[in-house]
Amino acid sequence: MLAWAGGDLHAFESLYARHRKRLFGFLLRQLRDNALAEEIFQDVWQRVISARAGWQPDAAFSTWLFRIAHNRLNDHWRAARHRPAAPADADLRLAALEDGHTPEAELSEFEQRRRIQRAMEDLPPEQREVLQLRLEQELSLEEIGQITGVGRETVKSRLRYAMDKLRAGLNA
């Protein structure tokens, strides 16, 4: 980020390539709408570009990037006042980003992902968000706290409650 802030365009290309798939996957899972996820994805990167000159390395770039995404999601939900239903093919769209699966394996994985998705949809938004940031983005508790604006213990509590509810939902 420092190299790009200093004017190195190749550094931006490297940052974008390194973080685009994780960021888009996070947004798609939160929004459950491909077109809206793409729109907010572009908006997040536009905000990164706009803020490049004033960026301070207080945290890792990925933490800063996901904090921007978190704030942008909150703006969207505040404006929309609702969460749209998940499109039926959201998992397939995300799976299309990956290669190498047989049709049988994809069907089995799809069924398993669908069960997990249903259980995750039943989680409160705060618990679902911290669970996705921890499991999918592999962020630390401190990074999740910075992104969501809550303390480490609150993050731990939300993760624990989310896992308990997820287990109960999958075992039902």
Predicted regions and their residues:
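N-terminal module of bacterial RNA polymerase sigma factors
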Residues: 1-22, 29, 104, 121, ...
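Sigma70-family region 2
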Residues: 5-6, 29-32, 43-60, 79-81
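Conserved RNAP core-binding helix
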Residues: 16-20, 24, 34-51, 139
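Short, Lys/Arg-enriched C-terminal cap helix and immediately downstream tail that follows
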Residues: 24-27, 78-81, 123, 128, ...
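Structural recognition of an alpha-helix C-terminal capping motif at a helix-to-coil junction
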Residues: 25, 39-46, 59-71
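Arg/Lys-rich amphipathic alpha helix in sigma70-family domain 2
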Residues: 50-57, 67-88, 109
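Internal acidic/polar
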Residues: 83-109
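Helix-turn-helix DNA-binding module
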Residues: 118-129, 133, 137-154
